Design a protein with these regions (language model features):
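Internal, well-ordered alpha-helical segments in soluble enzyme and binding-protein domains
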Residues: 98, 125-133, 154, 182, ...
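Extended hydrophobic secondary-structure segments that form protein cores and membrane-embedded regions
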Residues: 153-163
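C-terminal accessory domains and tails appended to enzymatic cores
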Residues: 2-5, 144-147, 152-154, 168, ...
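Conserved acidic residues
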Residues: 80, 112, 156
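Short acidic, glycine/proline-rich loop/turn micro-motifs
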Residues: 47-50, 169-173
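Active-site adenylate/phosphate-handling loop in enzymes that bind or generate adenylated species
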Residues: 105-151
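Active-site rim/loop-helix segments in enzyme catalytic domains that contact anionic ligands
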Residues: 1-109, 131, 139, 279
Length: 283
């Protein structure tokens, strides 16, 4: 058996990683691989009635609960973990200091695959997180950069999760992974982020009064909206799914998480593609 994969997902906020690739994380963990979610910020600005340390502590606890649900669903406690950095929300910048943080995180975890958002995004924290990952890509191999943390011998493959932004160019998927079998786990992971999906985001959209009070009713309300987006990823990558899984299975996929490879990461070959994405065998 080959060495387990090490999958590093870097987002700006303590719900970004699981929101975009939570299903993929569970699939990897179920196969014996290790997944780490990293939030560049502590999330201390994302609310309308609380902030600062209480919100940061709340959001870290939410993230840890989401990771625990993923690990439990994989049957491997600790196989999905969440690291939350103590940088202020809405204040992430592509500074040298922050680049060094990302370089050290990548070196210490030794990822085979790094996943983040594209640099084309509405939120400055998202844009700059993407830039920090790209800026760290080559320098993880340079011994005299962050010299006290042993450098990597290779540049890991980097991929972007899916989005709907069109300029300067639209998201162009290179791989799309079916998440039907874990989609309900993903919904339960996202439901851990109460401060976001049941409070801040509905408030910011003028829909706070629509949120049900009961836990199961809230989950049903949230999932009814989120599952449409999850299904849209499958519909948008239908041809790719059919090619990867075969026409019969690919055309039957309901939910998917697509990725686009970043040209600043390591090269993707037929051999390492098969190792990095061990999901496309016979149904």
């Amino acid at each position: 058996m080959s060495e387990p994969l090490r999958i590093l997902v870097i987002g700006a906020h303590p719900d970004d990683c699981d929101y975009h690739v939570g299903g993929l994380a569970v699939l990897y963990a179920r196969q014996g691989h290790q997944v780490r979610f990293v939030s560049m910020s502590n999330g201390d600005a994302g609310h309308f009635s609380m902030g600062g340390a209480p919100l940061a502590q709340r959001r870290r606890a939410e993230a840890e609960r989401a990771a625990a649900i993923a690990s439990d669903a994989a049957g491997r406690p600790g196989s999905v973990e969440y690291q939350v950095l103590d940088l202020h929300d809405a204040q992430i910048v592509p500074s040298l200091e922050n680049r060094q943080k990302v370089v050290c995180i990548m070196r210490q975890f030794r990822p085979d695959l790094v996943i983040t958002n594209r640099p084309n995004d509405y939120h400055p924290d998202h844009r700059y997180t993407s830039q920090l990952v790209a800026d760290a890509a080559y320098t993880v191999m340079v011994p005299n950069v962050a010299a006290l943390t042993p450098h990597l011998s290779h540049n890991p493959v980097i991929a972007y999760w899916g989005d709907g932004f069109k300029r300067p160019y639209p998201f162009t998927p290179d791989v799309s992974i079916a998440t039907d079998e874990v989609i309900q786990v993903k919904m339960r992971m996202l439901a851990c982020h109460v401060s976001q999906f049941y409070e801040w985001i509905p408030y910011s959209m003028g829909r706070l009064e629509e949120v049900p009070q009961g836990e199961s009713e809230r989950l049903e309300w949230f999932a009814a909206q989120r599952l449409r987006a999850e299904a849209s990823h499958a519909d948008a990558t239908r041809g790719l799914l059919a090619r990867l899984y075969g026409p019969e299975r690919g055309n039957a996929v309901t939910y998917a998480e697509p990725l686009e490879f970043c040209e600043y990461g390591g090269a993707v070959t037929d051999a390492n593609f098969a190792r990095l994405f061990p999901f496309f065998g016979p149904a």
